[in-house]
Amino acid sequence: MRKILRLKVGREDLILETGLLAKQANGAVLATYGGSTVLATVCCSDSVRENLDFVPLSVEYNEKYYAAGKIPGGFIKREGKPKDKEVLVSRLIDRPMRPLFDKRFGREIQVVPTTLSTDQMNPPDIVGMNAAFAAVFLSDIPFNGPIAAVRLAYLNNEFIVNPSFDEIQDSILDIVVAGSLDGITMVEGGANEVSEEVLLSAIDKAYEYIKQICNLQKEFVSIIGEREKLPLAYEEGVFEFKDELKNLIYSELKDACFVKGKLNRDKAIKLVKQKAYEHFSSISQVNEDNEFLFYKAFDDFEREIVRKSILENNLRTDGRTSTQIRDIVAEVDLLKRTHGSSLFTRGETQALAVTTLGTSIDEQIMDDIDGDKRLNFMLHYNFPPFSVGETGRLMTGRREVGHGHLAQRSLEAMLPKKDDFPYTIRVVSEILESNGSSSMATVCSGSMSLMAAGVPVKEQVAGIAMGLISDGDKYVVLSDILGEEDHLGDMDFKVAGTKNGITGFQMDIKISNVTKQLMKDALEQARIGRMHILSIMDSVISRSRDDISVNAPKIVQLQIDIDKISLVIGSTGKTVKAITDEFEVRVQIEQDGRITLFGTDSLKMQKAKAKIESIVREPKIGEIYDGIVKKINSFGAFIELTPIKEGFLSNRARSRDDRYGDMRHSRYGSGRHSRYGRDNRNTFGMNPPRLEEGQIVKVKISDIDKFGKIELELVRD
């Protein structure tokens, strides 16, 4: 049965519809906001897998070109593998939703939001998020919903709910917030040095609308009726000999949890686990049927030890207190041939960042339904398996795309405008070691490599990952969390920024009772930590170098009148090709008359610039040129001043010059009876100099008539 509900959210109505499309799915909702429409479906498999310690969830957001009235570019005219944007939106949907599924369900779950229409004004990603959340909540799959999402921009000191693309572009804050009726579950966004207070206010504002959208979903259920939920695959059991296990391992496990060094600590914990397993196996208390419960009980004890130590003793497994940051070592210029490089090591997390400068030809061309774009800044994050001491495939997964995007948006607000620095910038972060917060290490290393490359960034940027341990009554915010603290803790809050404010952030929360005061404490602690990290980075490099690397391509720019672009290009590109070949430069001409030269030899580039300036320069009386004799006739010679400008040097204007000899040796005859008359000396009063085609002569513009014809005279040295 078709049902439609709507709610005013910002400038438009959010319309949710079910019962018309994709009725064979476990759940399907069509969401519309303005002219953007997304269909979200959810399905689960029939097969059941027991004793899973994770939710087998996949989210596949996809955008159809027909949604914007377009046909895919390229040779293959159909949508292919997911673009980075689709991967990022899939992660936005996945992260707040995943903790609300019951692991005991045991079936694979697939959520597929598909953009069917877009007005290219209202971003379809936020529409897709709400469509997906509603589809799952209305389905027969066990889900602890409802949840909803809202985007905010901050423009002219006002918050805009679900802003347009243009408003996002002009805003100093772009934030997406997701949550349930119990509280916030996810925050992500980028900013241009906003304060912690503005960020907190944005989250508060977004949560007002999140609660309204959640209630809209509940109203949907009350209208169509709550569906009977599918059964769980198994009931969560308890290891029968848990008390015996605790008595056997607790003391030894506690010591193992505080062994220094990630690898040594992991090895010590695994040894305790192995000994315990062998003990219980030997007395037939662990077998294939209950070993899952054994491992779960062991992990519960490890979690209890780590969390209790932090809450009661303010002591973390590596010996730090809650506010301490791991030792930091930073350096630049490790790689001599690259344009800029930096190594940032924080504890056992290490990021090598390399900046490369290219030309506009190297820009990333984005062909998607929001319109074609050209990106002149890219950040690529690589996480090879050796960074955690493992083997595996070298590939770019969703995690790499997501972490790279967070680091990129944390840095891009500090980059110069393209008009001021017309290079294409690519930063590559190689994670060489990892024990938590590698994306924030990428921000730090990337910022320093940009400065080392001579990119005129506005401010240094640093990042830090914050964690949380809470028992409901008491909480402890952790600075610079380890990988295990991310896994065993209640929050992962990454914050990047400058000394002036926040530029990037991402927060995932596993608990529902996160108060505003808690978030305020976390942001303040992150600010203090960020200042500490910035001070260390600034001691290595505090400002961008005055010059770019000698290995980087050089750029020279000039501006010409639009109506003279054709003169520089020449017939069939002849003129610009000649400049390219002669001076070994790459020439880019914009429609507004801006010309950019790319090359490696500064002297040749300046000569190329002078050549172009001479082509477009308007000649003036009195100017002197080194011209080329192009053609000689009975009245004089045509002299090329520029590739597209010629002047005429008449015989009368030629004065005798010993460098050239006289007309008796010219192509026009010899002696007294030449084609100029019986006696040239009688005609002109002196012998005119000899000229030859291709000869270079110094001439001065003596006159320009009303038709633009140029008269020349010879210049003596």
From Swiss-Prot:
Its cofactor is Mg(2+). Keywords: Cytoplasm, Magnesium, Metal-binding, Nucleotidyltransferase, RNA-binding, Transferase. Its EC number is 2.7.7.8. Mg(2+) binds at residues 486, 492. InterPro entries: ExoRNase_PH_dom1, ExoRNase_PH_dom2, ExoRNase_PH_dom2_sf, KH_dom, KH_dom_type_1, KH_dom_type_1_sf, NA-bd_OB-fold, PNPase. Transmembrane segments: none annotated. Residues 553-612 form the KH domain. Its main location: cytoplasm. GO terms for cellular component: cytosol. Residues 622-715 form the S1 motif domain. Residues 666-675 have a biased composition (Basic residues). Gene3D superfamilies: GHMP Kinase, N-terminal domain (3.30.230.70), K Homology domain, type 1 (3.30.1370.10), Nucleic acid-binding proteins (2.40.50.140). Belongs to the polyribonucleotide nucleotidyltransferase family. Involved in mRNA degradation. Catalyzes the phosphorolysis of single-stranded polyribonucleotides processively in the 3'- to 5'-direction. This is Polyribonucleotide nucleotidyltransferase. It comes from Borrelia hermsii (strain HS1 / DAH). The gene is pnp.
